[in-house]
Structure formats: C-alpha cells, structure tokens
From Swiss-Prot:
This is ATP-dependent 6-phosphofructokinase. Homotetramer. Its cofactor is Mg(2+). It is found in: Cytoplasm.
Length: 322
C-alpha cells in the first residue's frame, strides 16, 4: 500500500473544512502516511495543483472559515476520459488513496475514482445538510448560527416598526437550514419544498399573527422556491397593508469562523477517515448518526441525494407556528 494520501475539498465551501484538512494531515502523519493537498477540488488533480502537506501551514487553519486549499465545481469530471486522466496523474505521483470533503457532487466524483482503483473515503462538507445517512454535515451548524444571528437582528428592527420580514436561506433542495433556523428564531411562517404557500395564504397567516398582538412576523423560506423574493414580499404588503421587507441571507452563510461543533465534528470524521485508510478500506462515506461516527458505502449514500428531515423536528416546527 502506497503511503501517499491525497486530500481535497470540492463543491461549495463550508465552515469546518479547514479543520477537516488539518486533522486529516495530522492524522495521516501520525499513522506514517505522507499527506498531499490537492488545490481547487477535482480540477486541481487535472491541473496538477498538488503539494506535500509538509510544505503548507495546515496546523494553523482550523479556526478559519472557507477552505484553505480552495474548491471548485468541475462538471467536466463527469466525463470518463477526465476521470481516467485523474487516475493517471495520481498514479504518477504515487497517490493511491484520496479523502474528499464536500457534498453529493464530491461524493459522486470520489465514487467514480473508487471504481477505477483509487481508494476513496468521503467526508460530508456542506452547509446544506443534504447528505443521506448523517444527522449533520460539516458546516451546517455554523451556517445555521449565522442565519439565526441574522434573523434575531431582523426581529429587533421588525418589532420596532411592526413589520413583516421575508427571509430566504440556502439549502438547495434540502429544507434543514430553513427549518432549524425557523425553530431557533421562532419564525411564525415557514415555506419549504414540502410546505409551499401562496402569497394569499401567507398574507392570511400574517394578518392572523398581528391580530394575536404580535409586533412582528418572520417568514423563513428555503431557496429555489420563489421566482422573485422582492415581488413576493411586495405582494404580501399589498394584500395585508403591513410593511413587509425581504432579505436574502446569501453567501454569508458559507463564511465565518466555524463553530466549535463543526470543528470537533470535522476532527472526529477526519480521524475516522484515516483509520479506514490505514485498514486499506475504500468506497466509504463518514457520517454522524445517532450520536456516533459511522460509515456507509458511498454508493448507498449517493443513491439517495436528498435527506429526509427528522420527524421530531417537523413536529417541533408545527408548535412554533402557533
């Protein structure tokens, strides 16, 4: 077994990725491996942006947001000839094992390399929390805290002006960021891909909330549902005659120093990944499920790209709407 291990981050960046990188490198060294950092995701393999970890200050990056080795979306990697080129380049360098950190696209890319003989272990690094068989992904907790802080501040000004705010958060096709932030902030109305409401329905609920004596109403929405957030807010104002503003939280959700939870989660997953590589395992994804670090076949994980939200969380959210 080759002692050279590649480490890359791919897809959208997520707070905690740097902690994963740091602990992957340190764990690899402690087991006698030679870690290599691959810059800018899968495209970095093709571009030969590969550097021995010993030549990079990986020790001091755990507290920083983003990913110090860069990331990218590389749709060309779906082509078999590009995958074959990646295997050829990794083999030339002597890298026989690879740890990839990212979302479902990253998992799919890693699985293709696994099928071609590269030993691959995958870590869930995405703020969307949309990976199957893990309760939390690296970056989700930090992004959630960013959203909660933003909505809490909106609530302050909304209370002062008897106003309604419509807030759109990230999550792609997964409702977890919207759902968990709605629970944490007491958002009165939640719109997700499993709970779509018309402007008329939202307006009726807004009026009901103000009729109860509430000084403000927060509407939290998952991205990719509304064609135009500002127009939606304007329609609510038109129907209710209540001052309504909109806010797209945007890419601030991806930034910021990772929470302690994300740093620790990344560290635990990284150490488990290196344990598996030391056992000559491949084609496995690391997860945090039911309070334990576990492993699943990557093939099983990517076959179900959208997670189902815990039923208990959904029930708690129903209570929050009253």
């Amino acid at each position: 077994m080759s002692k050279k291990i590649g480490i890359l981050t791919s897809g959208g960046d997520a707070p905690g990725m740097n902690s994963a990188i740091s602990f992957l490198a340190k764990s690899a060294l402690s087991l006698g491996f030679e870690p290599y950092l691959i810059f800018d995701g899968y495209s970095g393999i093709i571009a030969r942006k590969i550097l021995p970890a010993k030549n990079f200050p990986y020790n001091g990056i755990s507290s920083f947001g983003g990913t110090a080795i860069g990331s990218s979306r590389f749709p060309e990697f779906k082509k078999e000839e590009v995958q074959n080129k990646a295997v050829e380049i990794l083999s030339e360098i002597g890298i026989s094992s690879l740890v990839v950190v990212g979302g479902d696209g990253t998992y799919n890319g890693g699985y293709k390399l696994h099928l071609k003989g590269i030993k691959v272990i995958a870590l869930p690094g995405t703020i969307d929390n949309d990976i199957q068989f893990t309760d939390y992904t690296i970056g989700f907790d930090t992004a959630l805290n960013t959203i909660v802080e933003t909505i809490d501040k909106l609530r302050d000004t909304a209370n002062s002006h008897r106003r309604c705010f419509v807030v759109e958060v990230m999550g792609r096709h997964c409702q977890d960021l919207a759902l968990y932030s709605a629970i944490a902030t007491g958002s009165e109305i939640l719109i997700t891909n499993t709970n779509i409401l018309t402007p008329e329905e939202v307006s009726q609920r807004v009026l009901e909330q103000f009729a109860k004596g509430k000084p403000s109403v927060i509407v939290t929405i998952t991205e990719n549902i509304l064609p135009n957030l500002k127009e939606f807010a304007a329609k609510i104002e038109e129907l209710t005659k209540i001052s309504t503003r909109s806010l797209e939280v945007g890419h601030t959700q991806r930034g910021g120093r990772p929470s302690a939870f994300d740093r620790i989660l990344a560290a635990k997953m990284a150490m488990k990944a290196m344990e598996l590589i030391n056992q000559d395992k491949s084609g496995l994804a690391i997860s945090y499920l039911d309070g334990k670090i576990q492993t699943f076949d990557i093939a099983k994980v990517v076959s179900k790209p959208v997670r189902k939200t815990n039923d208990l969380v959904l029930e708690i959210n129903k209570i929050n709407q009253n």
